[in-house]
Amino acid sequence: MIGTATVSVHEGVVVHTTLDPVQQPFLDHHRIDGTPVLPGVMGMEAFAEAATLLVPELSVLGIDDVEFLAPVKFFRDEARTLRVQAVVVPDGDGFVARCSLSTDRMLPGHETPQRTVHFTGRVLLGAAAPEAERGDVPAAPTSPAMSADEVYSFYFHGPAYRVVAAAWRSGDTSVAVLTDPLIPDREPPDRPLCIAPRLVELCFQTAGLWQAGLEDRLALPMAVEHARFVPGRALDPAGVVHAIATERAPGVFDCVVVDAEGEVVVRLDGYRTIPLPGPVPAAAASALHATFRR
């Protein structure tokens, strides 16, 4: 996600990177109504990568106050240049980077390019690993579960973002198991990541299935209050990986991702969604209702 970078006293780190949906699976496989759209989780990854440019010795411990303000669309499958800004300031024993992702383009009636801010957030950087958090590894479902084919019969995600292998209800939570193996989501495929964006995506989709099953509506990401990552483990979790999402208020979810040993490798608190107009397709409703309504 990092292209050319400049540093200044007033603007901090500013990165310009050009992305092409023809080349990048995370765009080609993330289309809404046929148009590639930058996944919110890759915007978060861009924040993390930009924030660490000035303090590469520190780890990304979390990202707070993420706002998905406007989608980044790649019309006609054409490449676009993104501008990622990170202003890094001391914060206790670490640093905080105030980040934004924007684009510039010419619009009718204007003589100069107009800037749109799409995403904002704050990256938390530190040397000390967070205290280990344990969670319960979900048991195998005893009630109906949705298969990947059923999930992606109505979810718009292409192969690289089909992160749900199966999903079911457990009490008052939505549970999903991570697809294994995942196919490459970026080019080059071995380019390092900071925050395991597809584990965050697993949380988004797990919460979305709960809403779709109970409310008959699809929803898109709107905000994340707090996201926490275990450095190292989040990028290489052990064994079978599950996401467990709990709705704590209408359209507001907390979610954890646990590995096979029960370690919480990713935690999202206060993930908020915005519903799309129109109901879930009728063909998918029966499987959703059988799984999540009881």
Locations of the language-model features?
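Acyl-thioester-processing domains in fatty-acid/polyketide/NRPS systems
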Residues: M1-R294
